[in-house]
């Protein structure tokens, strides 16, 4: 992971910061709450549920970054894409690796829904809720 992470740092996509375990745990708690909320509204508001499950996964990845002493560079566009690249590097080889690698597809789905004309259906929510949960679980496990 370090060589590819160094490339993200070198390209100005990710930067080193002081690790902050307290902030990381708070962010992971937010992710869990988003997952719970997504489940509650999935049948009546699939698009809203998808935004919540995507944000849950993203915030969990952000929590991993904070715990590890990194963050996405704030001064550049494409922060969520950099988050996806980090997820694939940092979480992509463990038992939840497939879900971490699918985060970028989830990002693109969410963008198409937010900025395009694509409607998210319940089956997409159900499928990606599995991956969002796995990402949150992977980050939780990494905290020890």
Predicted regions and their residues:
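Terminal alpha-helical segments
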Residues: 1-144
